[in-house]
Swiss-Prot record:
Location in the cell: Cell membrane; Endosome membrane
EC number: 1.21.99.3
Active site positions: 122
Known partners and oligomeric status: Monomer. Homodimer. May undergo minor heretodimerization with DIO1 and DIO2.
Extracellular side: 21-258
Gene Ontology cellular component list: endosome membrane; plasma membrane
Pfam families in UniProt: T4_deiodinase (PF00837)
Name this protein carries in UniProt: Thyroxine 5-deiodinase
Membrane-crossing residue ranges in chain numbering: 1-20
PANTHER family: IODOTHYRONINE DEIODINASE, THYROXINE 5-DEIODINASE
């Protein structure tokens, strides 16, 4: 029954991937920044969600890409995390000291806990990691932040992307995942980082593959970002945190959740 419900969305995504292999369509749908825009990028703060660039050499419609899409959509369908529901509390491994903890162990009192799931081979995630660091610095006084390293989005022995920051094969053991997470640590040295277990318990509970954002507060899911790449938006999370901060400062204010 689940397969029947999932198939229309999967088929639509498959057709989209097939169309994106035609470069004329790809160039229209995935716009690249112009030279003028790139030159003016240094003026003012950079955007929270820089555009995702897909090189012409990348094949979008392959057996491996279809496997990855099906896997991600299946995890999203069966996830247990939903806005307003109790937050799943799977086991993770803290990168520092390799101590086994649970997601909610990183929460502190009534402060929101921001979860950012992703991997080093996910171009949108890595492109927005700097934005996430800025966000964490802006709201460190009211919220806590946790990066969770999950299975690779574009492993070198799977759906390969030439735009990936690193060439990393599928994790065969926990040490593989911990080594990959060390690379992410280099890009976000000031943010707590944990890795998913080898049975991908966190990714499954939160439907996190390819990448995803969540806000947990008092053991409840308060915000659930869309599935990456298209639904992965740091700007949307910033809006939620801005509204939350306004509510803290003005208890009578009306807050519209994103």
């Amino acid at each position: 029954a689940a397969c029947i419900l999932l198939f229309p969305r999967f088929l639509l995504t498959a057709v989209m991937l097939w169309l994106l292999d035609f470069l004329c369509i790809r160039k229209k749908m995935l716009t690249m920044p112009t030279a003028e825009e790139a030159a003016g990028a240094g003026e003012g703060p950079p955007p929270d969600d820089p555009p995702v660039c897909v090189s012409d050499s990348n094949r979008m419609f392959t057996l491996e890409s279809l496997k990855a899409v099906w896997h991600g959509q299946k995890l999203d369908f069966f996830k247990s995390a939903h806005v307003g529901s109790p937050a799943p509390n799977p086991e993770v491994i803290q990168l520092d000291g390799q101590k086994r903890l649970r997601i909610l162990d990183f929460a502190r009192g009534k402060r929101p806990l921001i979860l950012n799931f992703g991997s080093c081979t996910u171009p949108p995630f890595m492109a927005r990691l700097r934005s996430f660091r800025r966000l964490a610095a802006d709201f460190v006084d009211i919220a806590d932040f946790l990066l969770v390293y999950i299975e690779e989005a574009h492993p070198s022995d799977g759906w390969v992307s030439s735009d990936a920051a690193y060439s990393i094969p599928k994790h065969q053991c926990l040490q593989d995942r911990l080594r990959a997470a060390q690379l992410m640590r280099e890009g976000a040295p000031d943010c707590p980082l944990a890795v998913d277990t080898m049975d991908n318990a966190s990714s499954a509970a939160y439907g996190a593959y390819f990448e995803r954002l969540y806000v947990i507060q008092e053991e409840k899911v308060m915000y659930q970002g869309g599935r990456g790449p298209e639904g992965y938006k740091i700007s949307e999370l910033r809006t939620w945190l801005d509204q939350y901060k306004t509510r803290l400062q003005s208890p009578g204010a009306v807050v519209i959740q994103v």
